[in-house]
Structure formats: structure tokens, C-alpha cells
């Protein structure tokens, strides 16, 4: 497990290259698909269930790539990108705890969208609480999460599942 409890954008980019937790650790996406600018807090025993929590942020500005293509004359951040960021953070948590392999989203029990991220927004905040960790032949994390834009909760997800696989050839 890493001793660090917060991470910069540079750290997250290093994770995408396999240079943060080690070459065999789960990697974050690179470039435009990395939907996180910083991890403010990560721990292994906090959160509602006492199994870990993560708080992370994404800075919003009108020049972000998705505002140009989603939608013409009606720019809005795709909801699937916020959901993907939540999965990214579950995989990041498992790598932070020392899991090795390739991360894959396995599903989500429930998702609700009650707002949107527009170009004039300033900041998205992700808050995840880990519900369950499985470290057997299959490594898996299950979490509940919310996403806020400028302090207002607009997305919630229950039972986000991410698995870590040493071999993805049959996945």
C-alpha cells in the first residue's frame, strides 16, 4: 500500500504510464480520458463502511474536448465520463492498496443523474466510499459514489464494481 494520501495531476499521469505504484499496477487512462486532476484524500479505513474513501477533483473549463462535440450549440459533459471517472477511482484505490493487474469496470447497481456539467462550471468533485474489497483469485472493489459540480450533487452511483485481472485475454 502506498503511504501517500493525496495525489497531483502529475502523479495521476504517472499512474497511467505504470510509474506510480509499479509497472504491474492498474493504470489510469491517459490524456483526454483521464477525468481526474487530483486526489485530495484517499484512505483504507474511512468512509461510511470503514473500508476506505476517496475524494478527487476535475477542473472544468470551456476548452475541454467534450464540450466541442457533445452537443453542437448545447455543450454538456457526457454523463458517462463522470461515471467512468468513478470507476477510474475504484481501480486507482485498488492499485494504491497494492493490487497488480489490469483494471476493468464490471458494472454498477444504480446510477442517477440529477444535473449537468456545463462549460461555465468550475469544479467537479468525486466522493467515493468503498463498500467491499475482495483480494482472492479475483481482486475486486465495490463502492458507492457521488459527483458534485461546484458543490451541488448531480450524480450518484451505487455498487460500482471494478476488477483487477492479471490476464484479460478471455475477458
From Swiss-Prot:
Any idea what this protein is called?
3-hydroxydecanoyl-[acyl-carrier-protein] dehydratase
Q: What is its main location?
A: cytoplasm
Q: Which residues form the active site?
A: 70
Cite the GO molecular-function annotations of the record.
Answer: (3R)-hydroxyacyl-[acyl-carrier-protein] dehydratase activity; trans-2-decenoyl-acyl-carrier-protein isomerase activity
| UniProt record similarity statement | Belongs to the thioester dehydratase family. FabA subfamily.
Q: Which organism is it from?
A: Shewanella piezotolerans (strain WP3 / JCM 13877)
Reported function: Necessary for the introduction of cis unsaturation into fatty acids. Catalyzes the dehydration of (3R)-3-hydroxydecanoyl-ACP to E-(2)-decenoyl-ACP and then its isomerization to Z-(3)-decenoyl-ACP. Can catalyze the dehydratase reaction for beta-hydroxyacyl-ACPs with saturated chain lengths up to 16:0, being most active on intermediate chain length.
Q: State how it assembles.
A: Homodimer.
Gene behind this chain? Answer: fabA
Amino acid at each position: 500500500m502506498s503511504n501517500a494520501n493525496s495525489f497531483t495531476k502529475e502523479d495521476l499521469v504517472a499512474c497511467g504510464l505504470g510509474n506510480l505504484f509499479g509497472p504491474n499496477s492498474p493504470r489510469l487512462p491517459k490524456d483526454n480520458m483521464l477525468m481526474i486532476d487530483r486526489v485530495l484524500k484517499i484512505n483504507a479505513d474511512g468512509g461510511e463502511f470503514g473500508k476506505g474513501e476517496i475524494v478527487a477533483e476535475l477542473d472544468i473549463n470551456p476548452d475541454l474536448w467534450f464540450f466541442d462535440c457533445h452537443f453542437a450549440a448545447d455543450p454538456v459533459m457526457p454523463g458517462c465520463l463522470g461515471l467512468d471517472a468513478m470507476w477510474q477511482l475504484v481501480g486507482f484505490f485498488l492499485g494504491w492498496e497494492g493490487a497488480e493487474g489490469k483494471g476493468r469496470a464490471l458494472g454498477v447497481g444504480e446510477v442517477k443523474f440529477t444535473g449537468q456539467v456545463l462549460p461555465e462550471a468550475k469544479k467537479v468533485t468525486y466522493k467515493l466510499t468503498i463498500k467491499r474489497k475482495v483480494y482472492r483469485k479475483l481482486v475486486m472493489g465495490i463502492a458507492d459514489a457521488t459527483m458534485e459540480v461546484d458543490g451541488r450533487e448531480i450524480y450518484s452511483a451505487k455498487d460500482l464494481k471494478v476488477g483487477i485481472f492479471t490476464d484479460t485475454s478471455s475477458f
